[in-house]
Amino acid sequence: MSKSRLTVFSFVRRFLLRLMVVLAVFWGGGIALFSVAPVPFSAVMVERQVSAWLHGNFRYVAHSDWVSMDQISPWMGLAVIAAEDQKFPEHWGFDVASIEQALAHNERNENRIRGASTISQQTAKNLFLWDGRSWVRKGLEAGLTLGIETVWSKKRILTVYLNIAEFGDGVFGVEAAAQRYFHKPASKLTRSEAALLAAVLPNPLRFKVSAPSGYVRSRQAWILRQMYQLGGEPFMQQHQLD
């Protein structure tokens, strides 16, 4: 290898190492800060806002209103757990059984990819990472998930998740969603309304709370049944999530 190529390789290696250190400090600081402080915006919100501007849409505003857990209906927390991650109170950030099932499903159905992200993983990637699929992103997501599971309580993870989750075009967080779709604060959401919001979470830009399709309605009904099977509101109290 020539001296010039070695120099370039050395420069790239030093640059990548420094970048990794900077990102580690940035993300570590974010995990520590947001363990107690309200989250003003997420990486997904920034990405959506910048994308809108680049496409000439200057009316788009990625909107979110932070609320604490005692300002959110307990039905909402239960609904997202029932819909997205029923083992949330028990696991350490990853649902291994669901991951294995998703991998087996994806091998059989290459055109219908199934995910297995827990609420902790979704919180990590929505808060800190860009949209998309890659092994690099998955690796970073795993590290960030371990970080928030180590530093944050389960209640804190659920609180942040509910405040940064995307519920529609420009609608981020359960308070903004409750005001937009039901004209009430998140604390007043009913069991049915919470289940409807949770029903669009797999793809909130495709599925509409304001005009729910037959699929969304059937998913809402399924979530309501799962909420009942989990035990209703006592489930949240039992696991100190309310």
UniProtKB/Swiss-Prot annotation:
Pfam families associated with the record: Transgly (PF00912)
Biological processes annotated in GO: cell wall organization; peptidoglycan biosynthetic process; regulation of cell shape
Catalytic activity: [GlcNAc-(1->4)-Mur2Ac(oyl-L-Ala-gamma-D-Glu-L-Lys-D-Ala-D-Ala)](n)-di-trans,octa-cis-undecaprenyl diphosphate + beta-D-GlcNAc-(1->4)-Mur2Ac(oyl-L-Ala-gamma-D-Glu-L-Lys-D-Ala-D-Ala)-di-trans,octa-cis-undecaprenyl diphosphate = [GlcNAc-(1->4)-Mur2Ac(oyl-L-Ala-gamma-D-Glu-L-Lys-D-Ala-D-Ala)](n+1)-di-trans,octa-cis-undecaprenyl diphosphate + di-trans,octa-cis-undecaprenyl diphosphate + H(+)
Annotated GO MF terms: pentosyltransferase activity; peptidoglycan glycosyltransferase activity
InterPro entries in the cross-refs: Glyco_trans_51, Lysozyme-like_dom_sf, PBP_transglycosylase, Pep_trsgly
Enzyme class: transferase
Annotated protein name in UniProt: Biosynthetic peptidoglycan transglycosylase
Gene it is expressed from: mtgA
